Regions:
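The feature marks a conserved, polyanion-engaging helical scaffold used by nucleic-acid processing enzymes
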Residues: 1-65
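Catalytic core segments in nucleotide and nucleic-acid processing enzymes
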Residues: 43-171
Length: 171
Protein backbone atom coordinates (compact mmCIF):
# COMPACT_ATOMS: atom_id res chain seq x y z
CA UNK A 1 0.00 0.00 0.00
CA UNK A 2 2.77 2.45 0.93
CA UNK A 3 4.61 1.82 -2.33
CA UNK A 4 1.41 2.32 -4.33
CA UNK A 5 0.80 5.65 -2.60
CA UNK A 6 4.41 6.74 -3.17
CA UNK A 7 4.40 5.87 -6.87
CA UNK A 8 0.86 6.76 -7.93
CA UNK A 9 -0.01 9.74 -5.72
CA UNK A 10 1.52 12.72 -4.00
CA UNK A 11 0.49 11.33 -0.60
CA UNK A 12 4.12 11.18 0.59
CA UNK A 13 5.44 14.14 -1.45
CA UNK A 14 5.32 16.78 1.25
CA UNK A 15 8.07 19.12 0.12
CA UNK A 16 5.74 21.81 -1.22
CA UNK A 17 2.77 21.53 1.16
CA UNK A 18 2.16 22.85 4.61
CA UNK A 19 1.08 21.07 7.77
CA UNK A 20 -2.60 21.96 7.27
CA UNK A 21 -2.81 20.44 3.78
CA UNK A 22 -0.81 17.37 4.85
CA UNK A 23 -3.06 16.90 7.90
CA UNK A 24 -6.23 17.34 5.89
CA UNK A 25 -5.05 14.85 3.25
CA UNK A 26 -4.49 12.26 5.96
CA UNK A 27 -7.81 12.92 7.67
CA UNK A 28 -9.57 12.55 4.30
CA UNK A 29 -7.62 9.34 3.60
CA UNK A 30 -8.74 8.00 6.99
CA UNK A 31 -12.33 9.07 6.27
CA UNK A 32 -12.26 7.25 2.94
CA UNK A 33 -10.74 4.14 4.53
CA UNK A 34 -13.36 4.01 7.29
CA UNK A 35 -16.37 4.86 5.12
CA UNK A 36 -15.57 3.14 1.81
CA UNK A 37 -12.98 0.45 2.43
CA UNK A 38 -14.47 -1.43 5.41
CA UNK A 39 -12.24 0.40 7.89
CA UNK A 40 -15.31 0.94 10.06
CA UNK A 41 -15.08 -2.77 10.96
CA UNK A 42 -12.08 -1.98 13.16
CA UNK A 43 -14.47 -0.17 15.50
CA UNK A 44 -16.76 -3.15 16.08
CA UNK A 45 -16.50 -6.34 18.13
CA UNK A 46 -19.20 -8.96 17.74
CA UNK A 47 -21.45 -6.42 16.04
CA UNK A 48 -21.19 -3.85 18.84
CA UNK A 49 -19.37 -0.54 18.40
CA UNK A 50 -16.14 -0.04 20.29
CA UNK A 51 -16.39 3.64 21.06
CA UNK A 52 -12.85 4.67 21.91
CA UNK A 53 -11.42 7.91 20.63
CA UNK A 54 -7.93 6.46 21.14
CA UNK A 55 -8.50 3.86 18.39
CA UNK A 56 -9.21 6.59 15.84
CA UNK A 57 -6.15 8.51 17.03
CA UNK A 58 -3.93 5.45 16.56
CA UNK A 59 -5.17 4.97 13.00
CA UNK A 60 -4.46 8.63 12.27
CA UNK A 61 -0.95 8.26 13.66
CA UNK A 62 -0.30 5.38 11.24
CA UNK A 63 -0.99 7.67 8.26
CA UNK A 64 2.11 9.70 9.10
CA UNK A 65 4.66 7.02 8.15
CA UNK A 66 7.82 8.46 6.53
CA UNK A 67 6.75 12.08 6.91
CA UNK A 68 8.89 15.19 6.96
CA UNK A 69 6.51 16.68 9.52
CA UNK A 70 6.92 16.54 13.27
CA UNK A 71 3.83 14.67 14.50
CA UNK A 72 3.15 14.69 18.22
CA UNK A 73 0.20 13.33 20.18
CA UNK A 74 -1.24 14.77 23.39
CA UNK A 75 0.81 17.97 23.20
CA UNK A 76 0.17 20.20 26.20
CA UNK A 77 1.55 23.69 25.68
CA UNK A 78 -0.92 25.08 28.18
CA UNK A 79 -4.49 24.45 29.33
CA UNK A 80 -4.66 20.80 28.31
CA UNK A 81 -3.43 18.38 25.67
CA UNK A 82 -4.53 18.59 22.04
CA UNK A 83 -4.82 15.21 20.31
CA UNK A 84 -2.25 16.01 17.59
CA UNK A 85 0.08 18.85 16.72
CA UNK A 86 1.63 18.53 13.28
CA UNK A 87 4.38 20.98 12.44
CA UNK A 88 7.20 21.88 10.12
CA UNK A 89 9.22 24.35 12.12
CA UNK A 90 7.74 26.89 14.49
CA UNK A 91 5.76 28.85 11.91
CA UNK A 92 3.78 26.00 10.32
CA UNK A 93 1.61 24.19 12.88
CA UNK A 94 -1.75 22.44 12.61
CA UNK A 95 -3.81 20.96 15.41
CA UNK A 96 -6.12 17.98 14.93
CA UNK A 97 -8.68 17.11 17.59
CA UNK A 98 -10.73 13.90 17.43
CA UNK A 99 -14.14 13.49 19.05
CA UNK A 100 -16.74 10.78 19.27
CA UNK A 101 -20.25 11.99 18.47
CA UNK A 102 -21.42 10.29 21.66
CA UNK A 103 -19.25 12.61 23.79
CA UNK A 104 -21.50 14.30 26.37
CA UNK A 105 -19.47 17.54 26.07
CA UNK A 106 -19.43 17.59 22.27
CA UNK A 107 -21.09 21.00 21.89
CA UNK A 108 -18.85 22.63 24.50
CA UNK A 109 -15.73 21.04 23.00
CA UNK A 110 -16.56 22.10 19.44
CA UNK A 111 -17.37 25.63 20.57
CA UNK A 112 -14.31 26.26 22.75
CA UNK A 113 -11.69 23.55 23.12
CA UNK A 114 -9.65 23.86 19.93
CA UNK A 115 -9.58 27.66 20.09
CA UNK A 116 -7.92 27.38 23.52
CA UNK A 117 -5.39 24.91 22.09
CA UNK A 118 -4.72 27.22 19.13
CA UNK A 119 -3.84 30.08 21.49
CA UNK A 120 -1.57 27.83 23.55
CA UNK A 121 0.23 26.60 20.43
CA UNK A 122 0.42 29.94 18.59
CA UNK A 123 -1.48 28.80 15.51
CA UNK A 124 -4.82 29.38 13.84
CA UNK A 125 -4.71 26.18 11.80
CA UNK A 126 -6.81 23.36 13.18
CA UNK A 127 -9.46 20.81 12.38
CA UNK A 128 -11.96 18.80 14.35
CA UNK A 129 -12.76 15.24 13.32
CA UNK A 130 -15.98 13.66 14.63
CA UNK A 131 -16.69 9.93 14.39
CA UNK A 132 -20.29 8.75 14.58
CA UNK A 133 -21.73 5.23 14.80
CA UNK A 134 -25.43 5.63 14.02
CA UNK A 135 -28.07 7.98 12.61
CA UNK A 136 -28.96 9.37 16.04
CA UNK A 137 -25.35 10.43 16.66
CA UNK A 138 -25.12 11.88 13.15
CA UNK A 139 -28.24 14.01 13.69
CA UNK A 140 -26.92 15.10 17.09
CA UNK A 141 -23.71 16.35 15.46
CA UNK A 142 -25.62 18.17 12.72
CA UNK A 143 -27.83 19.86 15.33
CA UNK A 144 -24.81 20.93 17.39
CA UNK A 145 -23.05 22.33 14.33
CA UNK A 146 -26.21 24.17 13.30
CA UNK A 147 -26.67 25.66 16.78
CA UNK A 148 -23.06 26.88 16.75
CA UNK A 149 -23.31 28.25 13.20
CA UNK A 150 -20.64 25.81 12.01
CA UNK A 151 -22.62 23.65 9.57
CA UNK A 152 -20.46 24.65 6.62
CA UNK A 153 -17.11 24.83 8.45
CA UNK A 154 -14.59 22.97 6.27
CA UNK A 155 -12.40 22.43 9.34
CA UNK A 156 -14.96 20.08 10.87
CA UNK A 157 -14.88 16.65 9.27
CA UNK A 158 -17.46 13.97 10.02
CA UNK A 159 -16.60 10.29 9.63
CA UNK A 160 -19.32 7.68 9.23
CA UNK A 161 -18.46 4.50 11.17
CA UNK A 162 -21.97 3.05 10.94
CA UNK A 163 -22.04 -0.69 10.32
CA UNK A 164 -24.94 -0.45 7.87
CA UNK A 165 -22.81 -0.26 4.72
CA UNK A 166 -24.52 -2.10 1.86
CA UNK A 167 -22.49 -4.51 -0.27
CA UNK A 168 -21.98 -3.35 -3.86
CA UNK A 169 -23.85 -6.44 -5.09
CA UNK A 170 -26.93 -5.28 -3.16
CA UNK A 171 -26.98 -1.64 -4.24
Amino acid sequence: MIQILKVNTQFYDESAIGSYDASRARVMYLKDFIENKDGYKLFYHKGKPIKREKDLQLLFKLTWFATIFDVNAEVNNGRGPVDFKISKGDLDKTLVEFKLASNSKLKQNIANQVQVYEAANNTNQSMKVILYFNEIEYKKVLNVLDELGLSSDENIILIDACNNKISASNV
